[in-house]
């Protein structure tokens, strides 16, 4: 029997050229952690197989860190999931040209379902859709606007053949209050596609709980603030997740 492994994706969120973490996705709640490349290379050195790289300025529609992200991806030897502001053909193709293994669509999937369905058809498992949730309402545009009912949007994405979902409880993100296990369980009951959890991971115990969902279709977890805050190290987390 294959051992159940939870993939871990340490996050590097970039705003104004710096690696930062937000609390509940609020602009202005940033804590800066220095150069993004230093953070990304540190996670690679610690054994990460993935890095979750986010352009917050693009997500909030206030600019872009494209040149810097290109430099980060070029220096890494691990897989990169790229997120933030990918809303049309130009930004999607640009993200894939950077060398990202996978691209997260957020706002676009809510605001332009026709384009999203076409992107999924064209690029298959290179596309993941980020579902950022408050209760069962989706948040759009850097989490500042409502994006509709989670289950209605999920049904539409299932019909479009979406390959993977990244599910974030916005109320938990950056708070170190633990992941929303109930939301993830509901999501896993409604899709056969792999799901990646994001938001709230605060302890190794949280990762134990998430790993228990792997047999039900949870593929991985994005870990951010807990690593930066020193709640645990990435090697410790990888051990708990079943890697190494």
Swiss-Prot record:
One term under GO cellular component: cytoplasm
Pathway assigned in UniProt: Amino-acid biosynthesis; L-histidine biosynthesis; L-histidine from 5-phospho-alpha-D-ribose 1-diphosphate: step 4/9
Catalytic activity field: 1-(5-phospho-beta-D-ribosyl)-5-[(5-phospho-beta-D-ribosylamino)methylideneamino]imidazole-4-carboxamide = 5-[(5-phospho-1-deoxy-D-ribulos-1-ylimino)methylamino]-1-(5-phospho-beta-D-ribosyl)imidazole-4-carboxamide
Active-site residues (renumbered): 13, 132
Membrane spanning residue stretches: none
EC number annotated for this UniProt entry: 5.3.1.16
Gene Ontology MF term list: 1-(5-phosphoribosyl)-5-[(5-phosphoribosylamino)methylideneamino]imidazole-4-carboxamide isomerase activity; phosphoribosylanthranilate isomerase activity
Cross-referenced CDD domains: HisA
Keyword Isomerase (UniProt): yes
Positions of disulphide bridges: none
GO biological process terms on file: L-histidine biosynthetic process; L-tryptophan biosynthetic process
Record bears the keyword Cytoplasm: yes
Localisation: Cytoplasm
Keywords: Amino-acid biosynthesis, Cytoplasm, Histidine biosynthesis, Isomerase
PANTHER family: 1-(5-PHOSPHORIBOSYL)-5-[(5-PHOSPHORIBOSYLAMINO)METHYLIDENEAMINO] IMIDAZOLE-4-CARBOXAMIDE ISOMERASE
HAMAP family for this protein: HisA
Similarity annotation: Belongs to the HisA/HisF family.
Name assigned to this protein: 1-(5-phosphoribosyl)-5-[(5-phosphoribosylamino)methylideneamino] imidazole-4-carboxamide isomerase
């Amino acid at each position: 029997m294959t051992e159940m492994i939870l993939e871990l994706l340490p996050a590097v969120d970039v705003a104004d050229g710096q690696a930062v973490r937000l609390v509940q996705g609020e602009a202005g709640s940033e804590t800066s952690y220095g150069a993004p490349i230093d953070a990304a290379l540190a996670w690679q050195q610690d054994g990460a197989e993935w890095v979750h790289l986010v352009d917050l300025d693009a997500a909030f529609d206030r600019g872009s860190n494209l040149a810097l992200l290109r430099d980060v991806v070029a220096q890494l030897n691990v897989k990169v999931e790229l997120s933030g502001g990918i809303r049309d053909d130009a930004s999607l193709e640009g993200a894939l040209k950077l060398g990202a293994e996978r691209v997260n669509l957020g706002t676009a999937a809510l605001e332009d379902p026709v384009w999203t369905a076409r992107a999924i058809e064209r690029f298959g498992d290179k596309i993941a859709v980020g579902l950022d949730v408050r209760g069962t309402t989706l948040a759009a545009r850097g989490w500042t606007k409502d994006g509709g009912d989670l289950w209605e949007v999920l049904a539409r994405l299932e019909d479009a053949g979406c390959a993977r979902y990244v599910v974030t409880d916005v109320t938990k993100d950056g708070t170190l209050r633990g992941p929303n296990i109930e939301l993830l369980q509901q999501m896993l009951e409604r899709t056969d596609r792999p799901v990646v959890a994001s938001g709230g991971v605060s302890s190794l115990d949280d990762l134990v709980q998430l790993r228990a969902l792997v047999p039900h279709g949870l593929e991985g977890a994005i870990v951010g603030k807990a690593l930066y805050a020193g709640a645990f190290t990435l090697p410790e987390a990888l051990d708990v997740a079943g890697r190494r």
